[in-house]
Amino acid sequence: MQRSRKLEELRRLVRATRLARANRMTLNEVLEQAAERPHRLTEPSRRRFVKDLGAIAGAGLLLNNLPAHAFRSRPPRIAIVGGGIAGLNAALTLQDAGLASTIYEASSVVGGRIHSNATAWEENQTSEWCGEFIDSGHTCMQALVNRFGLTLVDELEAEPTQSTDTLFFFEQYYGVKQAFLDFQAISDRLEEDANNLFPTTFDPATHFPRSVHLDHMSAYDWIENNVPGGHRSSLGSYIDSAYTNEFGLDTDRQSALNVVYEMGFQPESSEFSIYGESDQRFHVLGGNDRIPFAIAEALPKESIETEWWMESIAKQPDGTFGLTFFTPHGIRYVTADHVILTIPFSVLRGLDYRKAGFDTLKDTAIQHLGYGTNSKLTVPCTNRLWNEHGPWGKGDGSIYTDLFFQNTWDSSRGIPGKAGVLVAFMGGAAGLALDAAQSPFASAETSPEVAMYAKHFLRAANHPWPGIESLWNGRATLSTPWKAPNLLGSYSCWKVGQYTAFSGYEGVRQGNCHFAGEHCSNSFQGFMEGGATEGARAAQEIISDLEGNL
């Protein structure tokens, strides 16, 4: 969904005013900088609160630590740690500017959390182990799709006419129209808070009494205090379930601002959207991993090292960085003039960066940023019962419920065929409960635990969708990225108090060590778009540093 142009201009001026105040600049100076680098103030937002203050608030760290003559006699040495979409797009952006880099990836393949399953299902259907959705406003991912001649499937366009989500709470259906009516009781205050308080970041200039109050309130308590009937109401239970699986942690651990900044900005249509403007509309035909594979193919083969696990990073007296890797060929040492760290903070916090020269706030963000514990159970069915008329109405494949699985969607939307691929997605304690499979990415064929979970899910789903249990074909997969050593979480999530503590600082560079990944994105946290845009941003920092030095 696209935001109102007038409202966005107002928000842009609010952001610029706060940036000017925080950095002792004039409003015109901030707007001139934004004109030179437009994404600073006008980047489309997933959660509708664009707060990329980090790059400017950390202005003291933006200076190139190496002398101006450092690269006149040799090319700069640029190391990118992590071969997910952030690292790959950083390398591609650098290559477009004529700069070479080397990616060091810990696993055996590139892609990070973007890897598809195109072989397990019938009728050439594809599912995603992790990263799945591309929104209408995800311009960076869409640009990569266009650049490499790939095709997007419009999943919303493919849904049957007049189909709706199935809402099922307290063992009864909760109509979408009733949810809209119930939402009216909280919509005005929610919209007021979202408009008046954003952005809320580590910068004290954004710390208004109510934003600080809401940041230190849990999402659970926000529901109890603001939704009539709290968790005893269908709307309260709906919001709790939806935001547990959306952010990946139980609502008693999340900042209330997660709900305010996502649900508070509704699309311009008259319909109520539980996730605000995020429409989760597209996926790539043939699998989303066609994007990282296409980028890798466009880079020199020798520029990607796989199975290189970073053990430590240290800043050298001359301003360069020394990196130590465990590799199949033993320990290897790399010296770099610039480093882009794209690995999740959940992984970085377990590595040795004590000598990297990071400041206290960066260390706090690395050590404490929350990460979701989502699990994704993918279950194929012999037909798409949910699209038929039933006691649930006419479904689009999505369930929101207080049953253990929280949420489903139809991963086969837009793909021809009779059979369907249903995804059950759960976060928080419910996600952690699916922990019996030994591998973080397992199938029913090799893991009896996955088959057990599939049966349990279908038995529960038979309540809102009678008859679904009998349509299972016996296959299933389970993704638990919080168990994967190179991920240790589904995606980042701001916990209670973390907006005001360090939100917006995750991507602030530390000398010539740059940071990228979805966890650095204030606009697209948790999305592939967040990784892609942050990779390009970190690369652009290096390009800007090196202008005139080559």
Where are each of the predicted segments found?
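C-terminal segments that line or cap access tunnels to active or ligand-binding sites in enzymes
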Residues: A336, I343-L488
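A glycine-rich dinucleotide-binding beta-alpha-beta segment and adjacent secondary-structure elements
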Residues: I468-C520
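C-terminal lid/capping helical subdomain adjacent to the catalytic/cofactor pocket in oxidative enzymes
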Residues: K6, T500-L550
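N-terminal secretory signal peptides
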Residues: M1-S45
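Catalytic cores of eukaryotic secretory-pathway lumenal/extracellular enzymes that build
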Residues: A120, N124-S127, G131-G137, M141, ...
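Active-site/ligand-binding neighborhood in enzyme catalytic cores
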Residues: P204-S312, G319-G322, T327, T335, ...
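N-terminal glycine-rich phosphate/pyrophosphate-binding loop and immediately adjacent elements
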Residues: R72-F198, D352
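N-terminal export signals
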Residues: T42, R47-A70
